[in-house]
Regions:
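N-terminal intrinsically disordered/low-complexity leader segments
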Residues: 1-13, 24
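C-terminal peripheral helix-coil segments that are non-catalytic and often amphipathic
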Residues: 1-3, 133, 137-144, 173-194
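Helix-turn-helix
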Residues: 14-17, 21, 25-59, 63
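Short, hydrophobic secondary-structure boundary micro-motifs
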Residues: 35, 109-113, 121, 151, ...
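Hydrophobic alpha-helical connector segments
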Residues: 63, 77-108, 156-160
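Short, basic, alpha-helical segments at the C-terminal edge of helix-turn-helix-like DNA-binding modules
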Residues: 66-73
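Amphipathic alpha-helical packing segments from all-alpha helical-bundle domains
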Residues: 101, 110, 120-147, 154-158, ...
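Amphipathic alpha-helical segments used for helix-helix packing
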Residues: 101-120, 169-173
Length: 194
């Protein structure tokens, strides 16, 4: 959506329109390019209208983070559910969904994992809880099937997320080529499973 598309705004959906425009701006200009006033201009509403939905810029960033975590959780859960019972296939599908999201929405993923909570904003968004729970469940299933090593499932969950985030960072930064994605994901599954 851009300046010319502001006519798509209808009473009652301004929050969704602002978030969509904020995601586009984030993709193109990074978090420093986001401001409530600029979002108002881009969506064709009064400069005060975004404040009805976001008290300040941090509230907008928090909402983007929550939206991103919810979407990533949905995509990873769907990828897991669409595969058969083979654990390695399920792990590979979840890993691929994470990296796909990161490649498409790298700036959003950076924002999601860079967000810090303070006393003024909510703790972990519900989507983040779902995402981390889904990865934790996947780890526990692998341990129960004796495909993943025994030990602290929380440690393995964090290690898996860190590995996937690292692969995504390498690809989005150009330090690894996109053509290497499949091999990197296959190697990840191979390294984690036994």
């Amino acid at each position: 959506m851009g300046v010319t598309d502001h006519r798509a705004y209808h009473h009652g959906n301004l929050r969704a329109v602002l978030l969509a425009e904020a995601e586009r701006t984030l993709r193109e200009h990074g978090p420093d390019g986001l401001s409530l006033r600029e979002l108002a201009r881009l969506t064709g509403v009064s400069h005060g209208a975004p404040r009805r939905h976001f008290a300040d810029r941090q509230a907008l960033l928090d909402a983007l983070t929550a939206t991103g975590f919810a979407r990533l959780a949905d995509e990873m859960c769907a990828a897991i559910e669409e595969t058969g019972p083979d654990y390695r296939t399920r792990l590979r599908a979840a890993a691929a969904a994470f990296v796909r999201f990161a490649v498409h929405d790298g700036a959003l993923l950076d924002l999601m994992f860079a967000s810090k909570t303070d006393g003024h904003h909510s703790a972990l968004p519900e989507g983040a809880v779902r995402l981390f729970s889904a990865v934790g469940d996947l780890v526990r299933q692998g341990q129960q099937a004796q495909v993943l090593p025994p030990g602290d499932p929380e440690r393995l969950r964090l290690l898996l997320i860190a590995t996937l985030q690292g692969i995504a960072a390498l690809i989005t930064s150009g330090r690894a080529h996109a053509e290497q994605t499949d091999d990197l994901l296959d190697d990840t599954v191979e390294l984690f499973t036994r």
